[in-house]
Amino acid sequence: MQVLVRDNNVDQALRALKKKMQREGIFREMKMRGHYEKPSEKRAREKAEAVRRARKLARKRAQREGLLPMTPRPVAAGGAAGAARPPR
């Protein structure tokens, strides 16, 4: 995995790398491989994750159909939307 360092800004490159790794699921993979997981525990975890996904999907579908109220999105601490990050 590669990240470009622009203008010797290592902090920005590290943030970009961390975001890429998060998106790719590398941190989750490292956590899962950190210890042995019994097959029965793996099945139970995967089943619980599937139930969680199904509930989330059903909740989103109900909100779209108007059966549940839409949850308001949290407002950023910076105030106006997009003010925290300069345009590219």
UniProtKB/Swiss-Prot annotation:
One of its GO terms (cellular component) is ribonucleoprotein complex. GO terms for molecular function: structural constituent of ribosome. GO terms for biological process: translation. InterPro entries: Ribosomal_bS21, Ribosomal_bS21_CS, Ribosomal_bS21_sf. Transmembrane segments: none annotated. Belongs to the bacterial ribosomal protein bS21 family. This is Small ribosomal subunit protein bS21.
